[in-house]
Regions:
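Histidine/acidic-rich helix-loop-helix segments that form or flank divalent-metal centers
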Residues: 48-54, 95-128, 133-141, 146-176
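Acidic/His-rich, divalent-metal-binding segments that scaffold phosphate/diphosphate chemistry
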Residues: 1-96, 107, 113-119, 137, ...
Length: 176
C-alpha cells in the first residue's frame, strides 16, 4: 500500500480548495509568496513552514458565509473562518505551533499585545500579506494607495508594513 507523503498533502488540499470558490483560486499561494519575500532575512526553515501555513490559511472560509467579506481589503469581524482554520491547523496539520498565526491573521495589531512576540509578528506578516494580495487582485489602484491604507499603527505593525514595502520595491509583488 502506498501512502501519500506529507509534502503532497498541502498540494492536494490547495488544489481542492481552488475548485470550491474561484475568488480564492491561488490566494493562499500568492500570500505565501508575498510572505516569503517579506521574510527574506528569517530562518529558511521557519519561512518554509509559514509559507505552507499560508497556503491553507483561509481553509476555514469554505465552512463559513464570510467569503464575500474576506476578499475585500477592509475586513471587519471576520473571525469565524480564522477559528475554523486555527482548529484545522492545530488538529490536522504538522503546523500546530503556527495555528495561532492563522487564528490571528485578521486581528488588529492592538489586539495581539498579550500574545507571544513571535506569534504577533508572524500573524501581522500574514495579515499584511493577505491584505496586499486582496488589494493587488481585486482593486485596480496604485501601490501607494495600499501603503496609505496600511499606514494605521493600531491595525498594522509599521515594521511589518515596511517589510512589505521593501519586498514590493524589490519584486513587484502585484505580478505574483
Amino acid at each position: 500500500m502506498t501512502l501519500i507523503h506529507a509534502d503532497k498533502i498541502i498540494d492536494i488540499v490547495t488544489r481542492s480548495m481552488n475548485y470550491i470558490d474561484s475568488r480564492l483560486v491561488d490566494h493562499g499561494k500568492r500570500v505565501a509568496l508575498i510572505m516569503a519575500e517579506m521574510l527574506w532575512d528569517q530562518p529558511a526553515a521557519m519561512v518554509s513552514r509559514l509559507c505552507a501555513a499560508a497556503l491553507i490559511h483561509d481553509m476555514g472560509a469554505y465552512r463559513t458565509e464570510e467569503l464575500n467579506r474576506i476578499v475585500r481589503f477592509e475586513t471587519e469581524e471576520v473571525w469565524e473562518h480564522s477559528v475554523y482554520g486555527y482548529l484545522f491547523m492545530r488538529e490536522v496539520t504538522p503546523f500546530r505551533d503556527l495555528a495561532k498565526v492563522v487564528l490571528y491573521h485578521h486581528a488588529e495589531r492592538s489586539r495581539l499585545e498579550r500574545e507571544d512576540k513571535q506569534i504577533r509578528f508572524y500573524a501581522q506578516v500574514m495579515c499584511v500579506a493577505d491584505r496586499a494580495d486582496c488589494f493587488f487582485t481585486f482593486e485596480n489602484k496604485a501601490d501607494e494607495i495600499l501603503m496609505q491604507r496600511l499606514d494605521c499603527p493600531e491595525k498594522f505593525d509599521p515594521a511589518v508594513v515596511a517589510r512589505l514595502k521593501k519586498a514590493n520595491e524589490r519584486c513587484r509583488l502585484r505580478e505574483y
